[in-house]
Design a protein with these regions (language model features):
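Conserved structural core of kinase catalytic domains
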Residues: 66-133
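Catalytic activation segment of kinase domains across protein kinase-like and atypical kinase folds
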Residues: 130-195
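ATP-binding glycine-rich loop module of kinase domains
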Residues: 6, 12-58, 62-66, 87-91
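A conserved mid-domain beta-alpha-beta active-site/ligand-binding segment of alpha/beta enzyme cores
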Residues: 198
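Short loop/turn segments at strand-loop or loop-helix junctions that form parts
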Residues: 36-37, 79-84, 166-169
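Hydrophobic residues embedded in beta-strands of well-ordered beta-sheets
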Residues: 32, 77, 162-163
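Structural motif
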Residues: 28, 73-74, 159
Length: 198
């Protein structure tokens, strides 16, 4: 039997995205993550997490990125729990040592890793417009067909692989990869006043 040791409700969202995230532990101390639909409208969103797992696993199968195992459960999904140091924590250690060259190198490595798989030229699609609206972007931008826009530094745990611990916001259409990189850097800088000088 698994016992819930942490729970977070995301019920401030639109009804079709409302979920609960639980961390559970079994009697052996093994941990698991459950993402559960809070209503019938959000079941499609939960199903999308499983679909994202399949898409990302295929995309990153020959890379240094690992997509933790995901299985379907009643009204939700169960994800493999990964512990370790996040890329954010690693960047903080480098930043607090004031080794700015290494910090930039590590962020460039992140950009290279996420750019290396499935890259192609950007085109605005109907699906893109539905999510991001009408925007003018160059068709020379590098993009990918499968994109986790929440691939921020806090969502990557590094051990022998780069483990993506949250892929709830993955889309199966072209998105400029520079947007994902920009978003990750912005969230990292804005996440702590200590990082403001960046």
């Amino acid at each position: 039997m698994k016992e819930i040791i942490y729970s977070k409700y995301s019920n401030e969202r639109d009804a079709k995205f409302q979920i609960r995230t639980d961390i559970l532990m079994n009697k052996y101390g093994d941990k698991f993550v459950h993402k559960i639909a809070l209503n019938t409208n959000s079941i499609k969103h939960i199903d999308g997490i499983y679909t994202s797992y399949l898409l990302l696993t295929e995309l990153y199968k020959d890379s240094k990125i690992n997509v933790p195992k995901c299985t379907k459960i009643n009204n939700g999904v169960e994800l493999e729990y990964i512990s370790g140091k996040t890329l954010s924590e690693e960047l903080d250690q480098i930043f607090f040592r004031e080794d700015y060259a290494q910090l930039v190198d590590r962020i460039r490595e992140y950009a290279k890793v996420i750019t290396s798989e499935g890259a192609e030229k950007f085109q605005i699609t109907e699906e893109f417009v539905k999510v991001f609206g009408e925007v003018e972007l160059s068709n020379t931008l590098i993009s990918a067909n499968v994109n986790n826009i929440d691939l921020i530094f806090d969502n990557i745990i590094i051990n022998d692989k780069w483990n993506i611990i949250d892929y709830e916001w993955t889309f199966n259409f072209l998105i400029p990869i520079n947007f994902i990189i920009y978003r990750a850097i912005k969230i990292y800088i804005d996440g702590s006043q200590k990082r403001n000088e960046l």
